[in-house]
């Protein structure tokens, strides 16, 4: 399998912790933590055929600083033939009306650039009203709620890593 580029915003330690856990759970796959998103350039995204991108959702459904500044640039890239798996952190109890909306914003940007999204997961087990991250009844990636469901995080990451390894290798979307 080709090297995977891992991109995430370091604005919150939780996102960094989840990125580290994902890298560990992908054992045997070469993952290069590119640079923190605040130091990423367009050519960093174009250098990888397989990418994992992550961000938390802030306030009323916004991306953290740096990701929000990078989205217009992402949308203008040519990422046809590239696969992107997204992970996002959110709080379903306190923000049920925009739960992990940041993932949806990233998904829109990468799709506009021509990338194929992989790593879709079930919405079962979450209690929320609305989310921009839901596509066809599934989340457009791995959803982590460390505030309310931390006990489920390790299994969710392990299951998702197994799934995206297969999808990156085969091109199959769940």
At which residue positions do the language-model features occur?
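Short acidic/polar alpha-helix capping motifs at helix-coil junctions
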Residues: 2-5, 35-38, 70-73
